[in-house]
Amino acid sequence: MKENIKRVLPFLLVLLFAFAPLALASAPVDAPAPADAPADALPSAKVISAPADAGVIEAVELEHATVTGAHDVAVAHVADSLSHEKLMDLFWRVLNFAVLMAILIKFGAKPIANALSGRQQRVKSEVEDLEARRIVAEKEFRQFEAKLANVEKDIDSIVDKAVAQAEIEKAKILERAEQAAADIQKSAEQAIQNEIANAKRSLKNDAADQAAVMAEELIVKHLTADDQVKIVEDYLAKVGAV
């Protein structure tokens, strides 16, 4: 409670110094008497009959009497403005203000202090929350940087592996292409050899057929009737022997 009062007391003092002059100024005060007060309010100036050569002395005495009368009127006015009723009115005004301040201190200090304390706690909590978020963000940022560095390393490793794999695939493709070319060449050579053999065989067959035809023609051309009879007899003899 004392801490709450200490927190609120400066604000109350500010309010006190702010409203006290207003309370004092609100007390009714009679208007000051004008400088040129009526002649009946001032003590009569003593008129001194004197000859013409005493005019200066008479003017000085008249001015002194005027100033003295004005001073007496002002003193009387101040005494009248600070009468008992006005002092009591001022007293009750100040007392009312003091009671109001006491009520504010009694019933308003704790809520105000609680509000200020709650606000302070909320601000502190928000600051702590922001600080925690900042720490988490920095941690995540460092983790992201580490991951990014690892990703760059992984990318370099993947590129190197891809290049090496591409070289291996290139070598395999060239090897398969060379093997395919060799197989094609071998197949072509074999096909050529087969065609040559077939051609030779065909030529031999054609030549044999042609030779047989030519031999048949020659035999028929030079075969006589006796030769034909002899051939038939020989054939029948062979058939009979079988």
From Swiss-Prot:
Pfam family, any one: ATP-synt_B
Keyword terms, alphabetized: ATP synthesis, Cell inner membrane, Cell membrane, CF(0), Hydrogen ion transport, Ion transport, Membrane, Transmembrane, Transmembrane helix, Transport
Keyword 4Fe-4S listed: no
An example Gene Ontology CC term for this record: plasma membrane
Main location: membrane
Topology within the bilayer: Multi-pass membrane protein
Database matches in InterPro entries: ATP_synth_b/b'su_bac/chlpt (IPR002146)
Places the protein is found: Cell inner membrane
GO molecular function, one term: proton-transporting ATP synthase activity, rotational mechanism
TM regions (residue ranges): 8-28, 87-107
HAMAP family, alphabetized: ATP_synth_b_bprime (MF_01398)
Job description of the protein: F(1)F(0) ATP synthase produces ATP from ADP in the presence of a proton or sodium gradient. F-type ATPases consist of two structural domains, F(1) containing the extramembraneous catalytic core and F(0) containing the membrane proton channel, linked together by a central stalk and a peripheral stalk. During catalysis, ATP synthesis in the catalytic domain of F(1) is coupled via a rotary mechanism of the central stalk subunits to proton translocation. Component of the F(0) channel, it forms part of the peripheral stalk, linking F(1) to F(0).
Family that this chain belongs to: Belongs to the ATPase B chain family.
PANTHER family: ATP SYNTHASE SUBUNIT B, CHLOROPLASTIC
Complexes and interactors: F-type ATPases have 2 components, F(1) - the catalytic core - and F(0) - the membrane proton channel. F(1) has five subunits: alpha(3), beta(3), gamma(1), delta(1), epsilon(1). F(0) has three main subunits: a(1), b(2) and c(10-14). The alpha and beta chains form an alternating ring which encloses part of the gamma chain. F(1) is attached to F(0) by a central stalk formed by the gamma and epsilon chains, while a peripheral stalk is formed by the delta and b chains.
Protein name: ATP synthase subunit b
